């Protein structure tokens, strides 16, 4: 599997640039042995809210939106210190949304905005959403358009290779990276 080969190259210092994969799995194969691999059936197409090409450099940070939303604002948060230390680099946030509904996602993004998570953001990247639950006929795009981050005037990229729907890019939090 190419994503596993890329991972091994990254941790051994033999790969510094990653590229999006061609296909991803929308639905996992039944796990019998645990060695089934990916069920690659869907074409990968990264999208932006404004449909423009993006080139952005900054310090990347993020993770599972479900988990970050729980930690945000607690004594384990640390975003104020991180923002202060790396504000000159600018931040590229990435999020993997595993189980949050679209409506919950909108509320969580508002909470993170109010806690200054996006104060020095240069871009925000979302992987493929694990849950597409909605009570109001949202799509990923309309969910992000209706959220507070759409008013930040920064690139918002979604449907990327960062999610519970593999394969996924290998991200090392805190490094300077360029997304293009």
Language-model-detected regions and their locations in the chain:
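Fold-independent oxyanion-binding glycine-rich loops
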Residues: 23-26, 63-64, 71, 96-98, ...
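ATP/nucleoside-binding phosphotransfer catalytic cores, i.e., glycine-rich phosphate-binding loops
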Residues: 123-180
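Generic secondary-structure signature for well-ordered alpha-helical cores
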Residues: 8-21, 70-77, 114, 153
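Conserved anion/nucleotide-ligand pocket segment
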Residues: 1-66
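Internal helical hairpin/lid segments
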Residues: 76-137
């Amino acid at each position: 599997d190419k994503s596993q080969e890329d991972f091994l190259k990254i941790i051994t210092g033999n790969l510094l640039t990653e590229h999006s994969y061609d296909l991803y799995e929308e639905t996992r194969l039944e796990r019998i042995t645990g060695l089934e691999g990916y069920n690659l059936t869907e074409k990968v197409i990264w999208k932006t809210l404004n449909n423009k090409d993006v080139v952005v450099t900054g310090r990347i940070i993020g993770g599972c939106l479900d988990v970050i939303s729980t930690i945000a604002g607690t004594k384990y948060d640390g975003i104020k210190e991180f923002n202060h230390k790396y504000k000159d680099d600018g931040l590229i946030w990435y999020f993997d949304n595993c189980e949050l509904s679209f409506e919950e996602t909108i509320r969580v993004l508002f909470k993170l905005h109010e806690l200054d998570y996006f104060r020095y953001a240069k871009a925000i990247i979302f992987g493929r959403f694990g849950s597409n639950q909605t009570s109001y006929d949202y799509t990923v795009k309309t969910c992000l358009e209706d959220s507070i981050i759409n008013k930040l005037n920064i690139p918002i990229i979604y449907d990327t290779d960062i999610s519970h729907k593999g394969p996924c890019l290998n991200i090392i939090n805190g490094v300077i990276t360029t997304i293009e």
